[in-house]
């Protein structure tokens, strides 16, 4: 049996089935995904609220990371990947052939399981995306670097060593640096694929506190194997199993009164 501290859960919730367009950051409609002959996602539909934290949970291989990577088209990089259905951002299907994928990925940032700083200084890591956009004004870059490092709760730790190599940071610091790099280009949506799985408990707590702060400016979607983490940081939780979205509701409901037997079995540790 897995113990979840219900006192740590968020209490605000939306009617997810009837979420208004103004409150919706992303809408996924009838999404199927295949890798060659193997189907990995089956008819997934959901609305993700703006400026909230939405968690995807489920056993290994259930499709949660695959679904996350659909949101900024990272699966385009996988051979023989075929997608049917729609993901709407501002009412436009991101899989429309007219979509600028590079612009989409600027608007929908992503942070992976293991910290992946570039072999550059701390400063150059943060402003890398801005330089790619042609921004080279020093004052503008300096302001963006400080704003982003503060936003990632790491400014006070690195402000006197901005020109040191990023590889000299601890794992937890590197992950916050990567988050700073992602938010420097001011995306609307931030995708986090198991962002603390490679970190120690103290660094994990720091990242969790940061996630709660990030939602004041960004829509955050997180994949996690850690159900206690999902309960602590998310407002909504989606439970996936074998490529299907089994249940999607406010986090308190998922962890205390799930409506589906599969969800209850997973939450209570009967499988997973």
From Swiss-Prot:
Q: How does it sit in the membrane?
A: Peripheral membrane protein
List the Gene3D superfamilies.
P-loop containing nucleotide triphosphate hydrolases
The family note in this entry says: Belongs to the ABC transporter superfamily. Phosphate importer (TC 3.A.1.7) family.
Q: What is its main location?
A: membrane
Among the GO molecular function terms of this UniProt record, one is: ATP binding
From the Swiss-Prot or TrEMBL record, state where the protein is found.
Cell inner membrane
Q: Which protein is depicted?
A: Phosphate import ATP-binding protein PstB 1
Q: Which reaction does it catalyse?
A: phosphate(out) + ATP + H2O = ADP + 2 phosphate(in) + H(+)
**How would you summarize the oligomeric state and partners of this protein?**
The complex is composed of two ATP-binding proteins (PstB), two transmembrane proteins (PstC and PstA) and a solute-binding protein (PstS).
Q: Which InterPro entries would you find in this protein's record? A: AAA+_ATPase, ABC_transporter-like_ATP-bd, ABC_transporter-like_CS, P-loop_NTPase, PstB-like
User: PANTHER family in the record, alphabetically?
Assistant: ABC TRANSPORTER I FAMILY MEMBER 17 (PTHR43423), IRON EXPORT ATP-BINDING PROTEIN FETA-RELATED (PTHR43423:SF12)
UniProt-annotated binding residues for ATP? 58-65
Annotated signal sequence is none
């Amino acid at each position: 049996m897995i113990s979840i501290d219900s006192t740590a859960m968020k209490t605000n919730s939306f009617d997810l089935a009837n979420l208004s367009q103004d409150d919706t950051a992303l809408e996924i409609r009838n999404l199927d995904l295949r890798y060659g002959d193997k189907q990995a996602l089956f008819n997934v539909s959901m609305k993700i609220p703006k400026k909230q934290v939405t968690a995807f949970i489920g056993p290994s291989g259930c499709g949660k990371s695959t679904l996350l990577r659909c949101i900024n088209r990272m699966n385009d990089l996988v051979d023989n990947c075929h997608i049917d259905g729609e993901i709407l951002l501002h009412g436009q299907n991101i899989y429309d052939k007219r979509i600028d994928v590079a612009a989409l990925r600027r608007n929908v940032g992503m942070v992976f399981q293991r910290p992946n700083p570039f072999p550059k200084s701390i400063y150059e890591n943060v402003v890398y995306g801005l330089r790619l956009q042609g921004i080279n004004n020093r004052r503008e870059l300096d302001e963006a670097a400080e704003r982003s490092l503060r936003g990632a709760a790491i400014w006070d730790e690195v402000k006197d060593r901005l020109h040191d190599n990023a590889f000299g940071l601890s794992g937890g610091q590197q992950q916050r640096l990567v988050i700073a790099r992602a938010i420097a280009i001011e995306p609307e949506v931030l995708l986090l694929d198991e962002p603390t799985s490679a970190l120690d408990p103290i660094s994990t707590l720091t990242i969790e506190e940061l996630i709660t702060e990030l939602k004041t400016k960004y829509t955050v979607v997180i994949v996690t194997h850690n159900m206690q983490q999902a309960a602590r940081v998310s407002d909504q939780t989606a439970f996936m199993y074998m490529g299907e979205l089994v249940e999607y509701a406010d986090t308190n409901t998922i962890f205390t009164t799930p409506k589906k037997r599969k969800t209850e079995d997973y939450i209570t540790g009967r499988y997973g």
